[in-house]
Amino acid sequence: MSNLTQVANENINAESTSINFTKAQSLGEKLELGNPVFWLSGSFLTLFVVLAFTNTSALSELVNIGFNYSTQWFGAYWQVLLLLNFILGLVLALGRTGQVRLGALALPEMSTFKWMSIVLCTLLAGGGVFWAAAEPIAHFVSAPPFYGEADPQTKALNALSQSFMHWGFLAWAILGGLSSIVLMHLHYDKALPLKPRTLLYPVLGDRAINSWIGNVVDACSIVAVAAGTIGPIGFLGLQISYALSELFGISDSFATQSVVILFAIAMYTLSALSGVNKGIQLVSRYNIILSVCLIGYILVVGPTSFIVDGYLQGMGEMVDNFIPMALYRQDTAWLGGWTVFFWGWFLGYGPMMAIFIARISRGRTIRQMMVSISIVAPLVTCFWFSIVGGSGLAFELESPGVISSAFEGFNLPAVLLAITAQLPFPTLIAILFLILTTTFIVTTGDSMTYTISVVMTGTTEPNAAVRTFWGIIMGAVAIALISMGSGGISALQSFIVITAVPVSFILLPCLWHAPKIATQMAKEQGIA
């Protein structure tokens, strides 16, 4: 018996060695090193970082030329695209097609609260704190051309209204509306891959899936969403480092910024490794709970009347001028810095976010998806902007300069601290907001790490190696860019808009294919 045991142990050891060797050999396969999409997207990001290190001025000049060209020639197109996307989504939701159930499941995979938590936290990203604090005061200090100059009270309401336009219905609809309908049908009903290239299948057929066109489409989408995610990760390092310096005297240095980003990398990579139903869902849930607690606190001790009135009047003003604001074209320079910039940023997220929404929304109806993503989520977002940015405006109206002076020089990190400084227990509230900022970034980082991995591997459960690789890469690029000072992050911000040019054409066919698919599915499901 002992001889048999010895032989068995030797066989097990040999098999273990063989397995380890196979694993070592297959690491390249796990990372998809043979995938053209990996080399296309990875090479482009690498080239960007190398240029940023070796010749920042040349990179900035190239990016600025591309940015100006993109906003000048494609800005109007993007404005029309987002508006039509929102309107058609509402039409599908409110008509008989709204009853169509997507994802080949009779019931949703997760509860509505968990689902909405993930949706809200992923799509808001760090902008939910960065811009919620800074954008209203920016529009107050320098009035948007659509409204022009007015008395301080009116300027404050106009500032909220303009912020609501940028973070409201149109922005949310492009992130998970018509494109998700197309992807969910083609993936779950037609067994096509859950990749950006599938969005072009109704136009190009098999060429979109099997040719070089599909590789380019996937690579463009990955580069766009990586750039859009790297930016907030870098902002997180700048925000937390600045706050630690102001609150505790810790040096606001590259070392501090790097430590913050490394911590974020660890958090969102571990969350992505655990999957949608564990880490991503857990972080999102606690993120929402902390947000609700801060909302409740500010409503109790803050400028409650202005927050509520500002929200209602700002929303009313925005809805009343919805079409004119959405299609405003008179000041193209201002549009390039604000509306068109945001539209480019959100468009860049479009295909990959559609994949993520498709992954977590199985069993939901078109009406549930469209109303939740295009109506409910924007209303919640705008109320959050009223809580954070509205409080800042109220404090500014009461004591001119208390917020605007901190914002001088477009100092985004300083605005949040200036607002919390006016509240009871300012240090504690500032710390809670910084924690919230971090968890917002983590939910976006883990979701996009997961989604990029899905596209690279072609499976909804990508292996740990590829998830870890892309999680680390995005954080490493953020660290590399902030090491060069403001020039690196500024170049990336402008580059985000450039990536939206090809991505916007990937999303364009959804305007006519989503209604066609929804109508076809309504007939198949026996919906009169």
Which residues are covered by each model-predicted region?
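Membrane-water interface regions at transmembrane-helix termini and the short interhelical loops
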Residues: 25-30, 56-70, 89-109, 159-167, ...
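Membrane-embedded translocation segments of transport machinery
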Residues: 208-216, 221-364, 371, 376-430
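Extracellular loop-to-transmembrane helix junctions
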Residues: 36-42, 68-85, 116, 157-188, ...
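Hydrophobic alpha-helical segments of multi-pass membrane transport proteins
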Residues: 44, 77-93, 291-302, 380-390, ...
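Membrane-interface alpha-helices at helix entry/exit sites of multi-pass transporters
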Residues: 76, 150-159, 208-219, 253-258, ...
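Flexible loop linkers connecting adjacent transmembrane helices
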Residues: 19-28, 61-67, 94-113, 137-161, ...
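Helix-loop-helix module between adjacent transmembrane segments
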Residues: 10-13, 20, 24, 28-53, ...
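N-terminal alpha-helical transmembrane segments of multi-pass membrane transport
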Residues: 2-155, 296, 508-522, 526-528
